[in-house]
Amino acid sequence: MELTWHGHSTWHVNVDGTTFLIDPFFSNPHTERKPTDIKKPDYVLLTHAHADHIGDADVFTDTTVVGVPEMTGYMESEVGFTESIGMNIGGTVECGDAYVTMHRADHTNGLETDYEYSIGVPTGYIISDNKPTRTADTDSTSFYHAGDTGLMSEMKDVIGTYLEPDAAALPTGDHFTMGPTQAAIAAEWLDVDHVFPMHYDTFGPIEIDINELVEEVGSGDTDATVHVLDGDETFIL
């Protein structure tokens, strides 16, 4: 599984040739890429409708958008997507050679439009190369994109226990989401091997010293390694 961070919360994930673009927003200082530089993904996954998560979604309308039904409905009727997969909390869908499970995120959601529009709830995703199961002993690899969220008990009780991700991209910039301390606790609860900070140093309120996360994880009850990626850097999971 190839994980490429394009800054903020934008990730490109390749699972055995099936490709995903999560929360496309290339107007951030970490990336040198433009959305038009990105090869068409098979799927665009959207966690919620804030502008710093869907800002460049309109560039990828010739692919399949995935999200809560309210989100995918909006993307079809107002943005121009013609193919969509509407799913909801707890659901798993097969996408090419991968499986995508949706989980909730503890955040707000909304759109600035000329009229009221229900856009659904914020979410996160677990992408795996095998279907989640409790009965089969599968050698799976999985990646958790937490979306915008605060610390949630479900990270320990559901995601960590049942879905068992190997790696997690966690918002770390504080103010609007978790900060370094909560993100480090999340890493413990998730029991992941790899932690990737995201949603930090994009604009003033979320500028932090990212070394705080490294120190917090290092002093906690976890063997996870923090990987502070450069913009557009790829990690092989």
Swiss-Prot record:
Pfam families: Lactamase_B_2 (PF12706). Keywords: Hydrolase. One of its GO terms (molecular function) is hydrolase activity. InterPro entries: Metallo-B-lactamas (IPR001279), RibonucZ/Hydroxyglut_hydro (IPR036866), UPF0173 (IPR022877), UPF0173_UPF0282_UlaG_hydrolase (IPR050114). SUPFAM superfamilies: Metallo-hydrolase/oxidoreductase. The keyword Hydrolase applies. The keyword Hydrolase applies. Belongs to the UPF0173 family. This is UPF0173 metal-dependent hydrolase HQ_3368A. It comes from Haloquadratum walsbyi (strain DSM 16790 / HBSQ001).
